[in-house]
Amino acid sequence: MAKVKRDISYLNKDFGDFRNQLINFSKTYFPTTYTDFSPASPGMMFMEQASYVGDVLSFYLDNQLQETFIQYARQTNNLFDLAYMFGYTPKVTSLATTQLDIFQIVPAKTIGTGSLPDFSYALDFPENTEVTGDGQTFTIQDNIDFTVSSSQDPTLITVAQVNGATPTYYLLNKKRNATSGDIQTTTFSFGEHQEFPTVDLQGTSIAQILDVFDSDGNEWYQVSALGQDSVYDKIKNTNVNDPNNSNGEEDTPYILQLKQVQRRFATRFIDNTTLQIQFGSGNAEANDEEIIPNPHNVGLGLPYTQDKLTTAYSPTNFIFTNTYGIAPSNTTLTVRYITGGGVASNVAANTLTNVDTTNTTFIQPTLNASLAQYVFNSVAVNNAGAATGGADGDSTEELRQNTISSYGTQLRNVTADDYLVRTLSMPSNFGSISKAHVQKPLNANSNTTLEIYTLSYDLN
């Protein structure tokens, strides 16, 4: 029997089109097999069921096609994927910042006919000391050493108590910037070596990863992409670290140092509550790196040599060794991360008054116990100004528009609009810009200067 060629239409999109096409198909190719096309007939029941399935699949196909375009996508996870594809990092929260005054008293000691503060009773606050108030937690990322005073970090001294005309106690005051958010800790265990392993960090309002250490004490560094093999590391500007520039340590207390790291990871938000951490593919026990380029093998044009003459260079990955870092194996990683922020973190002035002194210590270990306790109890903290910069994460439409704007700049700063986009794309751990405006200075003829005006959210 000869095979009959069927005329099939692929243009049907909804229930009615599918139903009519099935009826016409049956009448054309099975004219005597089935002739009852009334609504109550069994044959129409099967045709309408098939039309129903076709309509659902057609809708699903159209919807999924829309979800592949940033202009039309509506599902959060698809918008996040598209944002990363276009080079924009979604914001799920932004942290507020404020300046704090930290106080303590120290006893006076007699020097000749006068008196000076006894700095042996000065306190040392470690990094990431927490301050609370009005239901919010703020973190002081820098340590506080009251014995150190410089133009960049002055210790203000005033008389706190007197006996007649003689000071008995002095009040020490330091200022520090604080960022909203709670520090959370979690661990992930890894077994045998696996290329590009991923782990998911679950939580609400995840702002940033603070640090990652393995069970051997090695630090893992966050990079924007696993192909980036170097990071900028902040180190103190001392004579040991940089003899050539240490004479300017008061104006420049820290310097940036380019550091090549093999233990690294990249992060991306899957949705508003899930941060995925991905590691590299290398095995710490195997040498799988490419030979680092040097002047003897770059640009010779010979087989199996490096040719980097037409490559766009990045200062954080200028050797292009095609390595993606080490994958953790047979270890446990401890991850500290910050959660919180949002508009609610823009607390009013004079509300951050409680400081955690659990890890606070005296500079000198041997002191009078009762006097030391009195000094320790004198610790106080306050924010003279309101916290600003806290904002909720990107809404669906904000995420869409920010992604489209960010893609056009390609991370460059050339035009005024480029600077505007870079300003609005500030990492969330530094706060959030609500509105920004870029223009040339009104009273300057220079074409090389731009002024940036910014506004941030307050509590209301």
Q: What is the predicted function of each stretch?
A:
Residues 1-460:
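Signature of Asx- and small-polar-rich beta-strand/turn repeats characteristic
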